[in-house]
Amino acid sequence: MKHLLSVCDMDNVVDLLDLADDYKEGKIREKILRGKTLAMIFEKSSTRTRVSFEVGAFQMGAQPLYLSASDLQLGRGEPIADTARTLSRYVDGIMIRAISHSDVVELAGEASVPVINGLTDLEHPCQALADMQTIREKLGGFDGRLVFVGDGNNVCHSLLLITATLGMDMDVACPPGYEPDPGIREMAGKIADETGSRIRVIHDPSEAVRGADVVYTDVWVSMGYEDEAEDRLEVFRPYQVNMELMELAAPEAIFMHCLPAVRGQETTAEVIDGPHSVVWDQAENRLHAQKAIMHWLMGDI
């Protein structure tokens, strides 16, 4: 049974990108998922993940089924394994946006239908695929260098893995103590060694961004870290992606953000709404990338 829990589960990244492009260009009109149902479990609120999966499944002929934590018996103590086995009797695929990555791994271990990680505390593979689709269409390939500025979080983890897989150099500019997970760094480093790319973690954002082709940031206070908000806002202040920082990047550099954004914190309105920004194309590509993922996992190919 194929699942997408991590970027490392994509043994066909370029094929998926090509498929996503085909969906974006309207080359695939057949209802690949006609008669199928996708369960969408959300332990965290969502705009882009929910809407893109729901619209994408519908456009592919499937019936999306939204399930919040309060809709399921998980909140009342039903084991994850029991939920996985039960849903597998009803639906053809499960997309889950969860708090704990280990819960998603357990769910996939017991499910008899494909499970898609729609975001956990460790990874966000769907976002990473859409990001690479965006980079390829804007830059023409992966010869440039991506710099992630801010918290070494789940989005950063998936970007490290997918850029390494595609042979793209990536730097992470973050405060001491907010580096990416050591296990993810080690895994990405091994992949990078095989593909000839380079990964660095740097604490000086100016040094990291100088000459970069892609500058990427994310919120400083992710869901679940609200109690650290005051400390984080102070620690990350020097890591704001503003025009002064963007001017250090390559002249044709693009600015990316997985959204939602807090203008005035991790970036400024001048940047996110300015000429370098591709965030709306990036958000749109969530739809096309996730169609490719559903096609791959649920399309009987």
Curated annotation (Swiss-Prot):
Top EC class for this record: transferase
List of residues binding L-ornithine: 154, 218, 222-223
GO cellular component labels: cytoplasm
Binding site for carbamoyl phosphate: 46-49, 73, 97, 124-127, 258-259, 286
Main location class: cytoplasm
Statement: the UniProt record of this protein carries the keyword Secreted: no
GO terms, biological process: arginine biosynthetic process via ornithine; citrulline biosynthetic process; L-arginine biosynthetic process
Keyword terms: Amino-acid biosynthesis, Arginine biosynthesis, Cytoplasm, Transferase
One GO MF term: amino acid binding
Keyword Transferase part of the UniProt annotation: yes
Top-level taxon: Archaea
Record pathway: Amino-acid biosynthesis; L-arginine biosynthesis; L-arginine from L-ornithine and carbamoyl phosphate: step 1/3
Pfam family, one: OTCace_N
Cystine bridges: none
Reactions listed under catalytic activity: carbamoyl phosphate + L-ornithine = L-citrulline + phosphate + H(+)
Compartment(s) of residence: Cytoplasm
Enzyme Commission code: 2.1.3.3
Protein task: Reversibly catalyzes the transfer of the carbamoyl group from carbamoyl phosphate (CP) to the N(epsilon) atom of ornithine (ORN) to produce L-citrulline.
Family recorded in the similarity comment: Belongs to the aspartate/ornithine carbamoyltransferase superfamily. OTCase family.
Record's protein name: Ornithine carbamoyltransferase
Record organism: Methanothermobacter thermautotrophicus (strain ATCC 29096 / DSM 1053 / JCM 10044 / NBRC 100330 / Delta H)
Higher taxonomy: Archaea, Methanobacteriati, Methanobacteriota, Methanomada group, Methanobacteria
Gene: argF
